[in-house]
Amino acid sequence: MGNLQQLALDADIAAVKQQEKLLRLPEFNEDIAWQLGSYIRQIAVQKNYPIAITVARFNQPLFYCAMPNSSPDNKNWLRRKAATVAHYYTSSYAVGLKLKKKGVTTLSGYGLDDKDYATHGGAFPITVEKAGIVGYIAVSGLDQRDDHALVVQALAVHLGLPAEKTALEYLTQDSLGKARLDETIV
Protein backbone atom coordinates (compact mmCIF):
# COMPACT_ATOMS: atom_id res chain seq x y z
CA MET A 1 0.00 0.00 0.00
CA GLY A 2 1.44 3.38 -1.02
CA ASN A 3 1.76 6.42 1.21
CA LEU A 4 -1.21 8.20 -0.40
CA GLN A 5 -3.41 5.13 0.02
CA GLN A 6 -2.29 4.82 3.63
CA LEU A 7 -3.07 8.49 4.29
CA ALA A 8 -6.51 8.15 2.70
CA LEU A 9 -7.19 5.03 4.74
CA ASP A 10 -6.10 6.73 7.96
CA ALA A 11 -8.21 9.80 7.12
CA ASP A 12 -11.32 7.67 6.56
CA ILE A 13 -10.73 5.72 9.79
CA ALA A 14 -10.45 9.00 11.73
CA ALA A 15 -13.52 10.45 10.00
CA VAL A 16 -15.68 7.40 10.75
CA LYS A 17 -14.57 7.55 14.38
CA GLN A 18 -15.72 11.17 14.49
CA GLN A 19 -19.04 10.27 12.86
CA GLU A 20 -19.64 7.58 15.47
CA LYS A 21 -18.78 10.00 18.25
CA LEU A 22 -21.06 12.72 16.91
CA LEU A 23 -24.06 10.72 15.68
CA ARG A 24 -25.42 9.60 19.05
CA LEU A 25 -29.12 9.72 19.76
CA PRO A 26 -30.62 11.06 22.99
CA GLU A 27 -33.10 8.17 22.81
CA PHE A 28 -34.12 5.34 20.49
CA ASN A 29 -37.48 3.64 20.06
CA GLU A 30 -39.73 2.16 17.39
CA ASP A 31 -40.89 5.57 16.13
CA ILE A 32 -37.33 6.81 15.70
CA ALA A 33 -36.40 3.59 13.89
CA TRP A 34 -39.31 4.16 11.52
CA GLN A 35 -38.30 7.80 10.93
CA LEU A 36 -34.70 6.86 10.17
CA GLY A 37 -35.65 4.04 7.82
CA SER A 38 -38.32 6.14 6.12
CA TYR A 39 -35.86 8.97 5.54
CA ILE A 40 -33.44 6.62 3.78
CA ARG A 41 -36.32 5.12 1.79
CA GLN A 42 -37.42 8.60 0.69
CA ILE A 43 -33.93 9.29 -0.69
CA ALA A 44 -33.94 5.89 -2.41
CA VAL A 45 -37.28 6.69 -4.07
CA GLN A 46 -36.08 10.13 -5.23
CA LYS A 47 -32.81 8.77 -6.62
CA ASN A 48 -34.11 5.39 -7.77
CA TYR A 49 -31.62 3.52 -5.59
CA PRO A 50 -31.97 -0.30 -5.69
CA ILE A 51 -31.27 -0.77 -1.99
CA ALA A 52 -32.50 -2.67 1.03
CA ILE A 53 -32.73 -0.92 4.40
CA THR A 54 -33.04 -2.19 7.94
CA VAL A 55 -33.12 -0.50 11.34
CA ALA A 56 -33.04 -2.71 14.41
CA ARG A 57 -32.30 -3.16 18.03
CA PHE A 58 -29.99 -6.12 18.30
CA ASN A 59 -32.15 -9.17 17.48
CA GLN A 60 -35.31 -7.07 17.02
CA PRO A 61 -36.03 -5.69 13.54
CA LEU A 62 -37.95 -2.41 13.68
CA PHE A 63 -37.86 -1.33 10.02
CA TYR A 64 -37.18 -3.17 6.78
CA CYS A 65 -37.65 -2.12 3.18
CA ALA A 66 -36.45 -3.52 -0.14
CA MET A 67 -36.62 -1.02 -3.00
CA PRO A 68 -37.46 -1.94 -6.60
CA ASN A 69 -34.54 -3.59 -8.39
CA SER A 70 -32.83 -4.50 -5.14
CA SER A 71 -31.68 -8.08 -4.97
CA PRO A 72 -32.50 -10.89 -2.54
CA ASP A 73 -28.74 -10.86 -1.92
CA ASN A 74 -29.11 -7.43 -0.31
CA LYS A 75 -30.97 -8.97 2.63
CA ASN A 76 -28.01 -11.30 3.23
CA TRP A 77 -25.60 -8.36 2.96
CA LEU A 78 -27.68 -6.51 5.58
CA ARG A 79 -27.50 -9.50 7.90
CA ARG A 80 -23.73 -9.83 7.50
CA LYS A 81 -23.06 -6.10 7.90
CA ALA A 82 -25.29 -6.00 11.00
CA ALA A 83 -23.42 -8.98 12.46
CA THR A 84 -20.20 -7.01 12.02
CA VAL A 85 -21.62 -4.06 13.97
CA ALA A 86 -22.91 -6.41 16.68
CA HIS A 87 -19.52 -8.14 17.00
CA TYR A 88 -17.17 -5.15 16.82
CA TYR A 89 -19.49 -2.38 18.14
CA THR A 90 -18.41 -0.04 15.35
CA SER A 91 -19.54 0.55 11.78
CA SER A 92 -18.98 -2.15 9.19
CA TYR A 93 -17.06 0.40 7.11
CA ALA A 94 -14.69 1.16 10.00
CA VAL A 95 -14.03 -2.55 10.50
CA GLY A 96 -13.29 -3.00 6.80
CA LEU A 97 -10.91 -0.05 6.77
CA LYS A 98 -9.05 -1.29 9.85
CA LEU A 99 -8.74 -4.82 8.47
CA LYS A 100 -7.45 -3.45 5.16
CA LYS A 101 -4.85 -1.42 7.05
CA LYS A 102 -3.73 -4.58 8.90
CA GLY A 103 -3.80 -6.65 5.71
CA VAL A 104 -6.15 -9.28 7.16
CA THR A 105 -9.73 -10.45 6.76
CA THR A 106 -12.29 -11.35 9.40
CA LEU A 107 -11.36 -14.99 8.84
CA SER A 108 -7.57 -14.69 8.78
CA GLY A 109 -7.41 -12.08 11.53
CA TYR A 110 -10.22 -13.12 13.85
CA GLY A 111 -11.52 -16.52 12.78
CA LEU A 112 -14.88 -15.08 11.72
CA ASP A 113 -16.32 -16.54 8.53
CA ASP A 114 -17.13 -14.16 5.66
CA LYS A 115 -20.45 -15.93 5.18
CA ASP A 116 -21.51 -14.45 8.53
CA TYR A 117 -19.69 -11.09 8.55
CA ALA A 118 -19.36 -8.36 5.91
CA THR A 119 -16.86 -5.59 6.44
CA HIS A 120 -18.20 -3.37 3.68
CA GLY A 121 -19.71 0.01 4.44
CA GLY A 122 -23.40 0.34 5.15
CA ALA A 123 -24.09 -0.74 8.73
CA PHE A 124 -23.72 1.83 11.49
CA PRO A 125 -24.22 1.44 15.23
CA ILE A 126 -27.18 3.14 16.86
CA THR A 127 -25.66 4.67 19.95
CA VAL A 128 -27.84 6.20 22.65
CA GLU A 129 -26.28 8.73 24.99
CA LYS A 130 -25.87 7.27 28.48
CA ALA A 131 -26.87 3.81 27.22
CA GLY A 132 -24.34 2.83 24.57
CA ILE A 133 -24.85 0.87 21.38
CA VAL A 134 -28.36 -0.56 21.20
CA GLY A 135 -28.73 -1.56 17.56
CA TYR A 136 -27.86 -0.66 13.99
CA ILE A 137 -29.00 0.91 10.75
CA ALA A 138 -27.91 -0.89 7.60
CA VAL A 139 -28.16 -0.22 3.87
CA SER A 140 -27.12 -2.50 1.01
CA GLY A 141 -27.20 -2.05 -2.74
CA LEU A 142 -24.81 0.77 -3.61
CA ASP A 143 -21.06 1.17 -3.40
CA GLN A 144 -20.01 0.59 0.21
CA ARG A 145 -19.05 4.22 0.77
CA ASP A 146 -22.45 5.35 -0.56
CA ASP A 147 -24.29 2.83 1.64
CA HIS A 148 -22.37 4.23 4.62
CA ALA A 149 -23.12 7.82 3.56
CA LEU A 150 -26.89 7.22 3.41
CA VAL A 151 -26.94 5.96 6.98
CA VAL A 152 -24.78 8.83 8.23
CA GLN A 153 -26.98 11.35 6.43
CA ALA A 154 -30.14 9.93 8.01
CA LEU A 155 -28.66 10.13 11.51
CA ALA A 156 -27.34 13.66 10.94
CA VAL A 157 -30.68 14.94 9.65
CA HIS A 158 -32.52 13.27 12.52
CA LEU A 159 -30.20 15.02 14.98
CA GLY A 160 -30.58 18.38 13.22
CA LEU A 161 -26.94 18.44 12.10
CA PRO A 162 -25.84 19.63 8.66
CA ALA A 163 -25.49 16.36 6.75
CA GLU A 164 -22.79 17.69 4.44
CA LYS A 165 -20.56 18.45 7.43
CA THR A 166 -20.80 14.91 8.78
CA ALA A 167 -19.94 13.34 5.41
CA LEU A 168 -16.65 11.51 4.92
CA GLU A 169 -15.73 13.83 2.06
CA TYR A 170 -15.98 16.86 4.34
CA LEU A 171 -14.20 15.29 7.28
CA THR A 172 -11.29 14.04 5.16
CA GLN A 173 -10.64 17.26 3.19
CA ASP A 174 -7.49 17.75 5.18
CA SER A 175 -5.58 15.97 7.89
CA LEU A 176 -7.33 18.11 10.52
CA GLY A 177 -10.67 16.36 10.12
CA LYS A 178 -11.18 16.04 13.86
CA ALA A 179 -10.42 19.70 14.51
CA ARG A 180 -12.59 20.71 11.57
CA LEU A 181 -15.52 18.69 12.92
CA ASP A 182 -15.13 20.11 16.42
CA GLU A 183 -14.97 23.68 15.10
CA THR A 184 -17.90 23.59 12.71
CA ILE A 185 -20.54 21.38 14.26
CA VAL A 186 -20.13 20.97 17.96
UniProtKB/Swiss-Prot annotation:
This is UPF0303 protein ZMO1353. PANTHER family: PTHR28255, UPF0303 PROTEIN YBR137W (PTHR28255:SF1). HAMAP family: UPF0303. Pfam families: HbpS-like (PF03928). Belongs to the UPF0303 family. Signal peptide: none annotated. It comes from Zymomonas mobilis subsp. mobilis (strain ATCC 31821 / ZM4 / CP4).
